[in-house]
Amino acid sequence: MQWIRGGSGMLITGDSIVSAEAVWDHVTMANRGVAFKAGDVIKVLDASNKDWWWGQIDDEEGWFPASFVRLWVNQEDGVEEGPSDVQNGHLDPNSDCLCLGRPLQNRDQMRANVINEIMSTERHYIKHLKDICEGYLKQCRKRRDMFSDEQLKVIFGNIEDIYRFQMGFVRDLEKQYNNDDPHLSEIGPCFLEHQDGFWIYSEYCNNHLDACMELSKLMKDSRYQHFFEACRLLQQMIDIAIDGFLLTPVQKICKYPLQLAELLKYTAQDHSDYRYVAAALAVMRNVTQQINERKRRLENIDKIAQWQASVLDWEGDDILDRSSELIYTGEMAWIYQPYGRNQQRVFFLFDHQMVLCKKDLIRRDILYYKGRIDMDKYEVIDIEDGRDDDFNVSMKNAFKLHNKETEEVHLFFAKKLEEKIRWLRAFREERKMVQEDEKIGFEISENQKRQAAMTVRKASKQKGRVGEEENQSLELKRACEVLQRLWSPGKKS
């Protein structure tokens, strides 16, 4: 069988088409280049050049950097119909060499391939983190004339914490790795032991958008372009822009469930590692799901700021000072114990607080701020239909909020039982969200709050300008109509 050495020390059979996954985004303006995004699958058609491969994605073919992709470990899923079919691979984690031969049906060999890939990618990832911390961050700290502490915090987030965590994680992986028989390695327990540590990725992922915006502003100055490029060359890093390196942790945390799912696929149920890998897969799926959910919440904070700006007579702190998610909203009757009057209000339940609003009597789409309830101080009490002696009212579809410190009580009446059930479910969801946020230290940064406020101000100005233009246009139109009536032929002035 003929072997051709490809990029990154990989060996590929000369008559084979293999599949590779993009590790980095590749943007190209070249006529014969092929562009792709991280996660895309590329068919490698020619790997005879060490640095540049020829490949196909969808219907497009072209050249791309070999260092931007990784070959699939187990390529046996390809259909065996000829010499150009996808071949099976084996990756030696010590030499980083992927050898592609004939398909093997041996489950142990397949498991060894996945184990070896996990070990190899972890070692490469550690190097990327080291390059970021020592090649970029360390050099930036030396240039106080170019970077403030706040800027570096925004750009790099908690990358050093991630680096320290990953070094400890990889050390434990190495202890679990069986060099002689990789398929016997038991790495599932390692993920379970470190599961709480992976939550530090949440802070990094939540900050990543701010990092990109800050870098984008700096890169408008050629000094920063030259500085970051000099850092890359000095550290002997691959030809990727700094924003590409900073994206790596975001990509990495999302890859763990995929790798563990593949490992579980090739782990026999009687293998000593099976139940641990299955548990690790569930844990890492939950971690990535929660991180993605929190990232989505941060992307929606502009909407919360815009909503608050639309509420008239607002008092007190901004919603974003404590909350980041609207959980439920609805209209209910409400009685507050000291007054005992039944009032109709619109309630907006956020994490940590519930805002009370009153609709305008004429313009029902206009809301007036009427107060808020600190959900951290209250407990929810489900009430059966009947008479309440404390409030001296008949109750149906009711529940109470009881202040555990002051003994204050709020009584609520939903219009229907189904609505009451939805509210009770929403309160449980609110408490669960708060507990999970506290566990991983989730919060909105001051920079993100400022950004949301700026977005609202910008939108208000644009709306104001549009309104003025519409009014001016309407006045001009009316003036023209008047003039036309005054000076039309056959009519006296």
Swiss-Prot record:
Residues 325-432 form the PH domain. Residues 453-473 are annotated as: Disordered. Gene3D superfamilies: Dbl homology (DH) domain (1.20.900.10), Pleckstrin-homology domain (PH domain)/Phosphotyrosine-binding domain (PTB) (2.30.29.30), SH3 Domains (2.30.30.40). InterPro entries: ARHGEF9_SH3, DBL_dom_sf, DH_dom, PH-like_dom_sf, PH_domain, SH3-like_dom_sf, SH3_domain, SOS1_NGEF_PH. Residues 110-294 form the DH domain. It holds the Pfam family SH3_2. It is found in: Cytoplasm; Postsynaptic density. Its main location: cytoplasm. Residues 15-74 form the SH3 domain. GO terms for cellular component: cell cortex; cytosol; GABA-ergic synapse; glycinergic synapse; plasma membrane; postsynaptic density; postsynaptic specialization. It comes from the Eukaryota. Detected in brain, throughout the gray matter. Detected at low levels in heart and skeletal muscle. PROSITE patterns: DH_2 (PS50010), PH_DOMAIN (PS50003), SH3 (PS50002). Keywords: Cytoplasm, Guanine-nucleotide releasing factor, SH3 domain, Synapse. One of its GO terms (molecular function) is guanyl-nucleotide exchange factor activity. Changing residue 117 to A: No effect on GPHN clusters. Residues 107-117 are annotated as: Interaction with GPHN. One of its GO terms (biological process) is regulation of postsynaptic specialization assembly. Acts as a guanine nucleotide exchange factor (GEF) for CDC42. Promotes formation of GPHN clusters. Interacts with GPHN. PANTHER family: RHO GUANINE NUCLEOTIDE EXCHANGE FACTOR 4, RHO GUANINE NUCLEOTIDE EXCHANGE FACTOR 9. This is Rho guanine nucleotide exchange factor 9. It comes from Rattus norvegicus. The lineage of its organism: Eukaryota, Metazoa, Chordata, Craniata, Vertebrata. The gene is Arhgef9.
